[in-house]
Amino acid sequence: MPSLFAKSKLFDLIDKVEKGERLDHDAAVRLMNSQDILALGIMANIMRERKNGHQTFYRINPPFNDTNAHHATMIYGNLVSREEQLDHLFRLRALQDQTGEFVSFSPLSSDPKDQPLDGTTGIGTTTGIEDLKAMAISRILLDNFDHIKASWNLLGLKLTQVSLAFGVNDLTGSGVTKKAVIQMIQKAGRVAVERDGLGGSQ
């Protein structure tokens, strides 16, 4: 574990994540209440690379009905309490334990129907820190989900690129060229993999 986090109040949780231990509700509350975004990021990145290495899947201009795979979502922000978010995440984790049917999870800062088809600057009322925190905590707690997905139409290209260090390994959106998406992923030190509608590579 990096010595940088030796004095972090989340040090013990970083240790648990490194050891592959599942975090309980009390630990999740601590994550939600923490402002240590770097500690959250290191835990999420450990989980991300354990599951997917440096691979980052992407899909451009996906049709609304492009897949039969199961994807879960959660709206976060001012209209949803922290406890409601945690309840949602733990219910999903339990359901995934039982069924194993979900392919990916997408934390959303606003309703998907509000996404601009050609916008790449991000919309919504959350801050960048809140967005990264939502991505990281989702990755840390949903240890039985293979993919955490983000949309550059919601986050904007720059924050989407940063999210690749905070647990995200699957990108989607519209209004951007394939070359630009690949470049964004590669400049974040990741490997770009175009995916099909089922969450796998083409």
Task: Please name every model-derived segment.
Residues 59-61, 71-75, 105-108, 149-151:
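A cross-family glycoside hydrolase active-site/sugar-binding cleft signature
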Residues 25, 54, 70-71, 88, ...:
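Histidine (H) residue identity feature
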Residues 63-98, 116-129:
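Conserved non-cysteine loop/helix-boundary elements of the Radical SAM core domain that shape
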Residues 1-42, 46-51, 97-202:
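Auxiliary Fe-S-binding modules of radical SAM enzymes
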Residues 42-71, 158:
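N-terminal pre-triad scaffold of radical SAM enzymes
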